[in-house]
Swiss-Prot record:
Stretches the record annotates as Capsid binding: 122-128
Alphabetized UniProt keyword annotations: Coiled coil, Disulfide bond, Host cell junction, Virion
Location of the protein in the cell: Virion; Host cell junction, Host plasmodesma
UniProt feature coiled coil, ranges: 1-30, 37-58
GO molecular function, a single term: DNA binding
Any GO CC annotation of this UniProt entry: host cell plasmodesma
Cited InterPro entries: Caulimo_virion-assoc
Protein name according to UniProt: Virion-associated protein
Region feature Disordered, mapped onto this chain: 98-128
C-alpha cells in the first residue's frame, strides 16, 4: 500500500465515523438524550450497540477495507526468491573445463578431452 491509498482509506474511515456519529445522534433522539428511571440503561446501550454493529456489517466500505487488508496477506514472490531462482538457473560452474567431459556432447572445447567410457582397457584388466 502506498501513502495515497492509505490517505484515501483514512478519508473513508473518517466519513464512516461521521455517519456513525450521526446514527448515534438519531438513536439518542429517538430514545431521548437521557433515559428516564423506568427504562433500563443496559437495554438502551445494547440497542445502540446492536444498531451500530448492524450498520457496520451492512456497510460496503467495510468489505472493501477487509479486501484491501487481505491483499497484504496474499502470497507474493519476493525479489529475494526471484534472485535465488535466477542464481539456480544459471550454470554454477563457469570456469573453462578443459581436458574433461565429452567433446561430442559439447561439454568441452578441447579436442584432447577425456572420453567416457574409455575405449581402451587399462592394463592389467581387471584392476587388482
Amino acid at each position: 500500500m502506498n501513502l495515497a491509498t492509505i490517505a484515501s482509506e483514512i478519508e473513508v474511515v473518517k466519513t464512516n465515523q461521521k455517519t456513525i456519529e450521526s446514527k448515534i445522534d438519531q438513536i439518542l433522539a429517538k430514545i431521548g438524550s437521557t433515559p428516564d428511571e423506568s427504562s433500563n440503561l443496559e437495554s438502551v446501550a445494547a440497542k445502540i450497540i446492536s444498531d451500530l454493529t448492524k450498520e457496520m456489517k451492512e456497510c460496503h466500505c467495510n468489505k472493501e477495507i477487509v479486501e484491501i487488508l487481505n491483499k497484504d496477506k496474499a502470497i507474493i514472490p519476493s525479489p529475494e526468491q526471484d534472485s535465488i531462482q535466477k542464481r539456480l538457473s544459471e550454470p554454477q560452474y563457469t570456469f573453462p573445463n578443459f581436458d574433461v567431459g565429452n567433446e561430442g556432447m559439447g561439454s568441452s572445447t578441447n579436442p584432447n578431452a577425456l572420453k567416457w567410457p574409455p575405449t581402451e582397457k587399462p592394463q592389467p584388466w581387471p584392476p587388482r
